[in-house]
Amino acid sequence: MKLAVPDLISNSYFPAIAAVELGFFKREGLDVTLELIVPIEHALAAMRDGSLEFVGCSAHLLVAGFPEWRDVKLLCAQAQGMYWFLVMRSDLGARRGDLGVVKGRRIGAAHWVAMGLRRL
């Protein structure tokens, strides 16, 4: 079986990578190998056509490859909440915990991330 992730260096996919590398799947009787497939859309297409069994990705990305969640099932979460960081210019004087500093500001985000931020 193959598990694909779109990068090997960010913390985004660490749980999936660690599960393979530290033998979690083997202990469960599964022979799973890790494969790097970039971009994520290619990994989702490979899973759709049956050439791999698992994709480690953010849950919100699945709808890009499987509209309306057809023919795909979310097995587990790699993280809770949204693991992205909101960063601001230092000259704005933002202090930890002060959400008022974002009032009236524009926040830029990639399409699928933006959908998640709106939901929050």
Predicted segments, located by residue:
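A local structural motif
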Residues: M1, F24-L36, S51
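Bilobed "Venus flytrap"/periplasmic-binding protein-like clamshell domains
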Residues: K2-E28, W84, S90-L120
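Active-site nucleophile and cofactor-binding loops and adjacent substrate-binding regions
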Residues: I9, L36, A77
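Pocket-flanking alpha-helical
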Residues: I17-V20, E35-K73, W84-R96, L117-R119
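Short beta-strand/turn micro-motifs at beta-sheet edges
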Residues: F25, K73-L74
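Short active-site oxyanion
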Residues: V32, G50-E53, G104-I107
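Short beta-strand elements of ligand-binding domains
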Residues: C76-Q78, H111
